Amino acid sequence: MGCIKSKEDKGPSIKYRTEPKPDPGSQYGADPTQATQSPGIKGPAPNFNSHSMTPFGGSSGITPFGGASSIFSPTPVPYPGGLTGGVTVFVALYDYEARTTEDLSFRKGERFQIINNTEGDWWEARSIATGKTGYIPSNYVAPADSIQAEEWYFGKMGRKDAERLLLNPGNQRGTFLVRESETTKGAYSLSIRDWDEVRGDNVKHYKIRKLDNGGYYITTRAQFESLQKLVKHYSEHADGLCYRLTTVCPSVKPQTQGLAKDAWEIPRESLRLDVKLGQGCFGEVWIGTWNGTTKVAIKTLKPGTMMPEAFLQEAQIMKKLRHDKLVPLYAVVSEEPIYIVTEYMIKGSLLDFLKEGNGKYLKLPQLVDMAAQIADGMAYIERMNYIHRDLRAANILVGDNLVCKIADFGLARLIEDNEYTARQGAKFPIKWTAPEAALYGRFTIKSDVWSFGILLTELVAKGRVPYPGMVNREVLEQVERGYRMPCPQRCPESLHELMKLCWKKDPDERPTFEYIQSFLEDYFTATEPQYQPGDNL
């Protein structure tokens, strides 16, 4: 959200079609049945039509087992079992430093009795070690002695996010994790970092199925009483897998849901503005500190930018949008000047990262992966029937390991500035806006798709302003006449074809974000398998 500072021939017409996603089975390694018989338990032949759900798996709203890519449901569901009586023991998955006098500090491995879990995001707990009572973030703990408490269990994580984590620099061959299967209810996936001369570093995925009697197996000849025993076995022998399990994949400590219990509308005095990061037409962005304890990003809005009542109403919706590719909204100061408090992303905006940071050295695979992450977040916004309205590189934030998160979703609708609401002048992002939205104010998820196509040009051209050499009015006129930006220099034509799909005149002919995400995640296997890095891309 902010103002825009700004001062090529038609491609061939192609028809958009929804192509089927790749066969999920093709994502998994071959069934490793060729090795010798290995120890395990015997059980009846598996019934593939009867996969019972684990009590903490599936679509359970609370995802306490972390990992860099746990997706949090907007409506957390309490764990089953009599937690209010404090009979279920939970264990800490990460260290946590108290932010308020009501919080408990704790270390990874510390055990708790849960006193009250009705609040969802923050539970009242008693430390078994110290006897102290206070609030703890519910996504930092898991039931003791459960699969969720295992370091190698990453819960609800997609194939692509598993690959991103495992392929991070520093991980060796054999680094692994276990996650819920995306395609088979009640099953799991074992993801292992591998290496071969043809593909170099890559990740193999093996489906772990569940037996009717409660056992687990990758291949029917080696069955195990528990996932723990399965992992132990394959840590000792590859036994048909691509490589022996060597090291648990390092996880990233997840963001808490909110700053603390009941810390939503916060007093301005609880925030300290430390370092100014940027300034726009409608306000400033700062690194700040909340309550003297917690580093945050703070967006300060100029008085009159938006009505406080309307903002607070929209913010209530925004804080319920929870996805690992969306910047979480932590808290607000709802009186003017409005402050918006969010997660601090260390690499700043994608636009600055591409132009002035290490982003200018990125090759096509990294750029396409960043685009896939953004499409992942937008596919969630699409599923939630929400609209961003201002999707561009300036509103994407970058963290460590090229993690991308979408910021400022929904805020553009609330801006009261006359020049902005008239959709003309320097403050309105004409070059990113679909013609039906710019001309008639028809903002939909399909106008966001148009904007995503423009964002793709920013990625490939390393932050170059769209429609170079053209002013806003000229862009609007030319686009209405059918002009579309040509293929950026050294950009594969297949990626330009995706851009042109996003720029279809009829919004209904533009692809869904679900399709775009799938296309980009499988880009180098399905669309450009022969890609070789060049001097630029």
UniProtKB/Swiss-Prot annotation:
GO molecular function: ATP binding; non-membrane spanning protein tyrosine kinase activity; signaling receptor binding
Gene3D superfamilies assigned: Phosphorylase Kinase, domain 1, SH2 domain, SH3 Domains, Transferase(Phosphotransferase) domain 1
GO cellular component: anchoring junction; centrosome; cytosol; plasma membrane
PTM info: Autophosphorylated at Tyr-420 inducing activation.
Domain Protein kinase positions: 271-524
Active site: 390 (proton acceptor)
Positions of ATP binding: 277-285, 299
Lipidation, N-myristoyl glycine type: 2
InterPro entries: Kinase-like_dom_sf, Non-receptor_tyrosine_kinases, Prot_kinase_dom, Protein_kinase_ATP_BS, Ser-Thr/Tyr_kinase_cat_dom, SH2, SH2_dom_sf, SH3-like_dom_sf
Domain SH2: 152-249
Modified residues (Phosphotyrosine): 420, 531
Catalytic activity entry: L-tyrosyl-[protein] + ATP = O-phospho-L-tyrosyl-[protein] + ADP + H(+)
Statement: the UniProt record of this protein carries the keyword Kinase: yes
Domain of life of the organism encoding this protein: Eukaryota
Main location: membrane
EC class (word): transferase
Family, per entry: Belongs to the protein kinase superfamily. Tyr protein kinase family. SRC subfamily.
Function, in words: Non-receptor protein tyrosine kinase that is involved in the regulation of cell growth and survival, apoptosis, cell-cell adhesion, cytoskeleton remodeling, differentiation, G2/M progression and cytokinesis.
Protein name according to UniProt: Tyrosine-protein kinase Yes
